[in-house]
Amino acid sequence: MARIAGINIPDQKHTVIALTAIFGIGRTRARAICASTAIAETAKIKELSEAQIDILREEVAKYSVEGDLRREISMNIKRLMDLGCYRGLRHRRSLPLRGQRTKTNARTRKGPRKPIRK
C-alpha cells in the first residue's frame, strides 16, 4: 500500500478513486492531480512506480488535506461562534445554519426527541 499524506491508499483501485481516500480530495481534485502529474486516471496504484508515487505525494502536499484541513474547518466554526454571528449561534445550539425549517424535521441536527416532563 502506498502512503500519501499519512493515509494508506488502496492498491487495487484506480488512481482517481484511490486519491479520494484522502480527506479533502474529491473526484474533481483527484482528476486535476492526475492531469498535472501526467499519470493515467485508470492506472491502478500498484502499477505505479515509486517515482510516480513521489510525484503524487508532492502534488497532494500543495493542497490543504487531512489534519490541516480538519483543523482549518474547526477553527472557522470556532471563529464564527466567538464572533456571535447568526451562523455561530446556530452552530452553538446545534441547529441548521442555512434557513431550513426546524418546527418539524431537523431531527438529525437536533438529535433524538426529548420527552416533555409533566
Swiss-Prot record:
Pfam families to which the protein is assigned, alphabetical: Ribosomal_S13
Record SUPFAM superfamilies: S13-like H2TH domain (SSF46946)
Record-level GO cellular component terms: cytosol; small ribosomal subunit
Biological-process GO terms, alphabetical: translation
InterPro entries: Rbsml_uS13_C, Ribosomal_uS13, Ribosomal_uS13-like_H2TH, Ribosomal_uS13_bac-type, Ribosomal_uS13_CS
Keyword vocabulary terms for this entry: Ribonucleoprotein, Ribosomal protein, RNA-binding, rRNA-binding, tRNA-binding
Domain of life: Bacteria
Chain intervals for the UniProt region annotation (Disordered): 94-118
Example GO molecular function: structural constituent of ribosome
Keyword Phosphoprotein in annotation: no
Subunit structure: Part of the 30S ribosomal subunit. Forms a loose heterodimer with protein S19. Forms two bridges to the 50S subunit in the 70S ribosome.
Purpose of the protein: Located at the top of the head of the 30S subunit, it contacts several helices of the 16S rRNA. In the 70S ribosome it contacts the 23S rRNA (bridge B1a) and protein L5 of the 50S subunit (bridge B1b), connecting the 2 subunits; these bridges are implicated in subunit movement. Contacts the tRNAs in the A and P-sites.
Family: Belongs to the universal ribosomal protein uS13 family.
Name assigned to this protein: Small ribosomal subunit protein uS13
The organism's taxonomic lineage, starting at the top: Bacteria, Pseudomonadati, Pseudomonadota, Gammaproteobacteria, Alteromonadales
Gene behind this protein: rpsM
